[in-house]
């Protein structure tokens, strides 16, 4: 398929927007960019479709806040959505990579902390 680019879905809060202040409202993105994520997205877009996924985008003001935040940092993406699209990979700060082994999965869930709270 000429021109086909596989989709990469990237979570907004905690992956792009550092989210160190926590939830302030759908239209509020007060925290800085996660260092280097702009360059990663730019690189991925050479051969992938990049879609930003966030429950924040369910509200019009949230979708606009994401759009404005990306524009502020000169980040171009292929879409913003509130639902997870079919993708080859999902980049999320609140995920456990399932390896097919369920032995310690419940324990991993109980002990999980996103990178923004690891020191707490």
What are these regions (language model features)?
Residues 1-120:
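Catalytic phosphate/metal-binding cores of nucleic-acid and nucleotide-processing enzymes, i.e., regions
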């Amino acid at each position: 398929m000429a021109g086909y680019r596989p989709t990469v879905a990237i979570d907004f809060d905690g992956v792009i927007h550092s989210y160190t202040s926590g939830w302030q409202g759908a239209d509020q993105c007060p925290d800085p960019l996660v260092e280097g994520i702009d360059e990663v997205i730019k690189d991925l877009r050479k051969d992938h479709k990049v879609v930003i996924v966030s429950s924040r985008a369910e509200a019009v003001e949230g979708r606009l806040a994401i759009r404005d935040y990306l524009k502020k940092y000169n980040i171009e993406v292929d879409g913003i959505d509130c639902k997870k699209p079919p993708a080859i990979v999902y980049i999320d700060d609140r995920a456990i990579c399932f390896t097919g082994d369920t032995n310690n999965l419940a324990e991993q869930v109980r002990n999980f902390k996103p990178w923004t709270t690891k020191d707490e």
